[in-house]
Amino acid sequence: NIAIIEACEVTPDGKIYLTAAGGIAPTVCRLADQIIVELNAAHSKNAMGLHDVYEPLDPPYRREIPIYKPSDRIGQPYIQVDPKKIVGVVETNWPDEARSFAEADPLTDKIGQNVADFLAADMKRGIIPSTFLPLQSGVGNIANAVLGALGRDKTIPAFEMYTEVIQNSVIGLIRDGRVKFGSACSLTVTNDCLQGIYDDMDFFRDKLVLRPSEISNSPEVVRRLGVISINTAIEADLYGNVNSTHIGGTKMMNGIGGSGDFTRNAYISIFTCPSVAKEGKISAIV
């Protein structure tokens, strides 16, 4: 029962400061008998303070998760463990294996504009408040196009994000002042972008927070905040059934966080995709 935890810093009294993701690290550290800390120099110590580590109590003593806006911090910036559980610290310098996505094209730009127009219309109708609502977005070139369109639409005010992952496009919108705050479980950004965040942490410190996945993806919090979820579909039918994870029933293309945790609990749930795939040979509407 050994946990291996990546960190940017560890202290003699058992404080572990995580790097670019929260995941299930707090739970793993609590349950493990022994902990090996991977002290990764590829992640700057400037990451200290980026995380908000919180674990709910077990029933019957569990209370609500007291997050009432995306920027709320309810825990600690580190994982506290018994120092006796830490049996080793291994020093590494290994960057994340981040990948970039294809640039936007006329098709993805049009999808993005359609979403922006839809949300702007809902805001005019009073379905969405004039201050807007927090967004959750998946990752990929379509998601980038949607976020780009929302950022360019000046009828939509600067907004917050309560999401599972934050990608490069969100960081750009934060720098431009179009995203006021981003709450997520992980930073899924390119290494250059991540280094830029670390180098400019004085700017980002009050604009980003990383949480454990059971908090970032909590149905309770998603419902309370009135999150608008935007995820990519592989195929959908006219009855509203959406496949956003598998191709051919066996090849997994996407995780289930967006579809499983956010879509089912969001105030407004949106799926985006082109109408056809494989150069028009396969319909995405089945």
Name each region found by the language model.
Residues 1-286:
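Conserved alpha/beta enzyme-core scaffold
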